[in-house]
Amino acid sequence: GEKLTSPDHYILKQSVSEIVKVNTPAEFRIEILPTDGYEMEVEAPINLKFATENYPDLIFDKVSFSKKDLNDIKRPVFSGKITPKKAGEYNIKGELSFVVCTSTICEPKKTDINLHIKAE
């Protein structure tokens, strides 16, 4: 396959159902793709946490995710549902932390997540 490259040694892929009806879940998916010969450090924590206190009108089916929520630790994909109780636009923030390594070096990563949902 093609060799993925990034100065951060990983690429983040985020997707979300951007427009939903009120009381209908928006599904999100957040994928970490290590690049440049780096791989996920499977012994290290892989955590995703949403800042839910800012969003009283959203129902998160889960707020905090860890390795046990992943099907494949080497190809991590976090997915879940966020349901808006009121119409409006929401910028949902979270934080993702993980470690990528080569055979000789490890780099802890921490990155902001930003999902945008519009509820009609």
Can you describe what each PLM-predicted range is?
Residues G1-E120:
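Extracellular/lumen-exposed scaffold segments
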